[in-house]
Regions:
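N-terminal targeting sequences that direct proteins away from the cytosol to non-cytosolic compartments
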Residues: 1-133, 138-172
């Protein structure tokens, strides 16, 4: 499905990432963004304990980031993790939502959906406040959290696009 004025970002295979010993290369991921969204450098200072792999933003529409975290922090050592092995949607959002929004997610989850694409399961959440879509999946020995967020005005104006960005996330 090609959308006019949209482009696909795919994580380069040779992009560095991962920390410490025993890290395998990150399985690449991709997503679609409208024109005008650009990569924003990730500074070590803004990590705040989370493993942010990538940031994108559009000053008028919103911003997104990708967290790639080792599964072993949350589950027994899995080399071929699936999101289902980590837990059901409720367990996943309760455990990882705070990594994304910086606070407890209780009472903030508006909707939860499960989607299967190319044999991989994705959990999709909509939270507010803050306004955020989170898409979660697992691959290899990592958990992927894709977060698309915006302020109130951006959310109102660009809700459809923001949701489309969130739903376009794939681990390749």
């Amino acid at each position: 499905m090609e959308m006019t004025g949209w482009r696909t970002y795919r994580r380069p295979d040779d992009k560095s990432g991962g920390h410490g010993v025993g890290w395998s290369p990150i399985i690449p991921y991709s997503f679609k963004v409208p024109d005008g969204w650009d990569e924003v450098p990730v500074s070590i200072a803004d990590l705040g304990g989370t493993e942010i792999d990538l940031r994108f933003a559009n000053p008028k529409e919103g911003r997104l980031f990708v967290i790639v975290a080792p599964v072993r922090r949350f589950a027994d050592d899995l080399d071929d993790a699936t999101i289902e092995k980590i837990g059901n949607p409720e367990k996943v959002i309760t455990a990882f939502g705070p990594e994304v929004i910086g606070e407890n997610v209780e009472g903030k989850v508006l909707s939860t959906a499960t989607a299967e694409r190319s044999g991989r399961t994705y959990y999709q959440f909509e939270l507010e406040p803050p306004h955020v879509f989170i898409t979660a999946t697992a691959a290899g020995n990592r958990l992927y959290l894709f977060s698309v967020t915006a302020n109130g005005l951006q959310w109102k104006r660009h809700y459809k696009d923001l949701k489309q960005i969130a739903e376009s996330f794939r681990v390749v």
